[in-house]
Amino acid sequence: VPKEINDKRREENERAAELHSSFLMKMARRLYKMHQEKLLTHHNDETDWNRWKYAESLRRNFFFVNMINILGAKARLLNEQYFEPLGDDIVLQLPLPATEHMWRCCDEEEWAIAREHAMRRPANSPPVARTLRELLEQDKAGTLDASTLLPVTRLIFACAKVAPKGDSLGDL
């Protein structure tokens, strides 16, 4: 296939991706507004398994939408000049993902045990960041040990660190 045709096809795909990305951001923001109270309730504070499952699923999806958006811009699949952040009020305030043990529970009883276990911390252990904002503050203060983070949280953190300028994550 000639280079001209490949270049034209790539440009068309980039334009389509930019349009779809904008739609995805808009729908994510709308969904956040509809469920904001549930979404902002931390794992330690939620006692209803069904509400927790729903909110945790949504939270993880918001983080993935944000990561895809950032990585799409950084990989030049989306034009970085048109980068549209998901929104700090969403990404920085959401509780970070729960432990894998909690996430993989199959019933309420198993979840309650996993939740109880996750809430136990040694008395002299450093505070665990509950949000991306707290995680970034710990990093800035030099008190973050990224090796202690859950794999999904490490991905969220890494994407926040490489966010394009103009997204205040990229300006932190």
Task: Show the residue positions of the predicted features.
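C-terminal transcriptional activation/regulatory domains of eukaryotic transcription factors
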Residues: V1-E12
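C-terminal effector modules of eukaryotic transcription factors
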Residues: E12-L172
